[in-house]
């Protein structure tokens, strides 16, 4: 398991999210520019493997096309509360297809939930913010609602969580 966790002194949560998104786009763009032979090989390999799958199970875009999409588009941002509402009302949750059903606020998101948000609902990288304070670390800045903290996770298609971070608590009291 590999992940990036940006924590920058004097940055607020939005600045940390912007930094994470810019960093990921820089890395992907670097690979597109400097590793085209490798990416073409992987793209062809993926297409060969997916040709064995039923049409509805195949990716809508090839690997290189997906990477370009990441670089050229903004990541979708939503709060944990909004993500829970999307998941709670989703077909997989309503039809009990999720292994871990979403009942409401406080649910710890699992890989199946993250993949649904990224791959089915929004079809783009997703940033979830403002998690419940009881499922995150003590050092994260508590929001004014006293229920959530200034935390974020960046979710990528196929990969899942690739960046996690927060605004650190800086207030003495």
Model-flagged regions — what are they?
Residues 1-10, 151-157:
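Residues forming anionic-ligand binding surfaces in small-molecule and nucleic-acid pockets
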């Amino acid at each position: 398991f590999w992940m990036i966790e940006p924590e920058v002194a004097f940055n607020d949560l939005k600045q940390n999210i912007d930094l994470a998104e810019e960093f990921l786009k820089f890395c992907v763009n670097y690979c597109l520019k400097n590793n085209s032979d490798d990416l073409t090989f992987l793209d062809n390999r993926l297409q060969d493997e997916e040709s064995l799958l039923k049409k509805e199970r195949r990716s809508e875009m090839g690997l290189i096309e997906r990477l370009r999409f990441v670089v050229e588009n903004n990541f979708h941002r939503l709060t944990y509360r909004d993500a829970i509402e999307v998941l709670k009302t989703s077909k997989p949750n309503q039809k009990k297809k999720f292994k871990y059903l979403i009942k409401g606020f406080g649910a710890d998101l699992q890989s199946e939930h993250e993949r649904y948000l990224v791959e089915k609902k929004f079809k783009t990288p997703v940033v979830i913010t403002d998690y419940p304070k009881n499922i995150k670390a003590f050092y994260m800045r508590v929001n004014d609602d006293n229920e959530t903290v200034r935390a974020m996770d960046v979710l990528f298609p196929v990969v899942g969580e690739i960046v996690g971070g927060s605004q650190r608590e800086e207030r003495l009291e």
